[in-house]
Amino acid sequence: MAENYAGLTQLGQTVSQPASPDQAVLEKVPNPTPGKAYMIRFTAPEFTSLCPLTGQPDFAHIVLDYVPRDWIVESKSLKLFLTSFRNVGSFHEACSMKIAERVVSLLDPVWLRIGAYWYPRGGIPIDVFWQTGSPPDGVWIPAQDVPGYRGRG
């Protein structure tokens, strides 16, 4: 079993926070139940980045759902990747899509969707949604259940 994790560089180690998403290393491990159709959900209710023009902080509730194929994302590396946006200026749409595209590139999942529920800036919340295609049949895919903005709580 340990051989499945021999290539990991972050799990179980003391590592520095990456300075940017481009420097962050996303890692994967073998799917422990290959051939089974199931969904994995990661939720980051306190995601932060910076406005690229003003430098003001932006906040989002990110929900990432995917149906794995051969690989699953190693969660510590995902956490470090997500927190690497904290001091980087990027528009909401760019942050949201970069997260989804990096995970798709790493894992080649059967299916993936992201819901990025951004808190208002200038009085307007921006929500970004994307998925790789139609959800697969036979997999329970619950709603993301992030309420429409009313204090987003």
Curated annotation (Swiss-Prot):
Metabolic or biological pathway, per its Swiss-Prot or TrEMBL entry: tRNA modification; tRNA-queuosine biosynthesis
MF term (GO), any: preQ1 synthase activity
EC number, UniProt record: 1.7.1.13
Record GO cellular component, one term: cytoplasm
Keyword Oxidoreductase: yes
Broad class of where this protein is predominantly found: cytoplasm
Residue numbers annotated as active site: C51 (thioimide intermediate), D58 (proton donor)
Principal EC category: oxidoreductase
Matching InterPro entries: GTP-CH-I_C/QueF, NADPH_dep_7-cyano-7-deazaG_red, QueF, QueF_type1
Keywords: Cytoplasm, NADP, Oxidoreductase, Queuosine biosynthesis
Any one GO BP annotation for this protein: queuosine biosynthetic process
Gene3D superfamilies cross-referenced by the UniProt entry: 3.30.1130.10
Purpose of the protein: Catalyzes the NADPH-dependent reduction of 7-cyano-7-deazaguanine (preQ0) to 7-aminomethyl-7-deazaguanine (preQ1).
Family indicated by similarity: Belongs to the GTP cyclohydrolase I family. QueF type 1 subfamily.
NCBIfam families according to UniProt: QueF-II
The protein, known as: NADPH-dependent 7-cyano-7-deazaguanine reductase
Species per Swiss-Prot/TrEMBL record: Granulibacter bethesdensis (strain ATCC BAA-1260 / CGDNIH1)
